């Protein structure tokens, strides 16, 4: 005689045990299903916002008290998730605000267009002009320099202009910025020397 053929001591057969297990599994599935999401009311949101300003990371006891104030509309676990989401949202908005103020992303560099102009004055001395603009205004800068040079050429026919343009990466590190300026100064010195050599010949 096999086990499946013999009745159990409780009087259940094998078929009864299977149906009991199925019923138990069905109950477990219902309890493990996710709760439907519900939106907080305006009153709840106001209370939670005020509480968040005082205590952005409440303890379990504080969340339980807050749950009682909300008349159990939110469990302490739901409150914990709400506060986590609120802190993350605040961090994200602070990061976006900071990036907007800097004008660039966190890891990108601010690109600038620098123009070095060497002009000979009416007395024969060389003058050096240095200007720097953001890259997005390059075309405006080029037109402005062109118009300024045309106006200056009309007034002083003997003007000789040498334009040197260079892209400079300027990051948050001051060493990069000073190195770029040193490089431009060296370039300017060599341009002045070149201009003086041309005048001597």
UniProtKB/Swiss-Prot annotation:
InterPro entries: HD, Homeobox_DNA-bind_prot, Homeodomain-like_sf. Residues 1-42 are annotated as: Disordered. Keywords: Cell cycle, DNA-binding, Homeobox, Nucleus, Phosphoprotein, Repressor, Transcription, Transcription regulation. Induction: Expression is induced during S phase and depends on the MBF transcription factor complex. Residues 1-22 have a biased composition (Polar residues). The keyword DNA-binding applies. This is MBF complex negative regulatory component yox1. It comes from Schizosaccharomyces pombe (strain 972 / ATCC 24843) (Fission yeast). The gene is yox1.
């Amino acid at each position: 005689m096999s086990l499946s053929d013999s009745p159990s001591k409780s009087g259940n057969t094998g078929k009864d045990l299977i149906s009991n297990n199925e019923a138990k599994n069905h109950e477990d599935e219902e309890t493990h299903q996710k709760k439907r999401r519900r939106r907080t009311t305006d009153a709840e949101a106001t209370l939670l916002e005020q509480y968040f300003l005082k205590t952005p990371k409440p303890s379990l006891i504080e969340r339980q008290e807050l749950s009682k104030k909300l008349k159990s509309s939110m469990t302490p676990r739901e409150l914990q998730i709400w506060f986590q989401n609120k802190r993350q949202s605040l961090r994200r908005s602070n990061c976006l605000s900071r990036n907007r103020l800097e004008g660039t992303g966190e890891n990108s560099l601010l690109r600038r267009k620098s123009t070095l102009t060497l002009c000979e004055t009416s007395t024969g001395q060389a003058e050096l002009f240095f200007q720097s603009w953001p890259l997005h205004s390059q075309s405006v800068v080029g037109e402005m320099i062109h118009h300024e040079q045309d106006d200056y050429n009309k007034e002083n026919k003997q003007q000789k202009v040498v334009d040197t343009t260079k892209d400079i990466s300027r990051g948050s590190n001051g060493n990069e910025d000073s190195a770029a300026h040193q490089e431009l100064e060296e370039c300017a010195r060599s341009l002045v020397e070149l201009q003086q050599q041309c005048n001597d010949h």
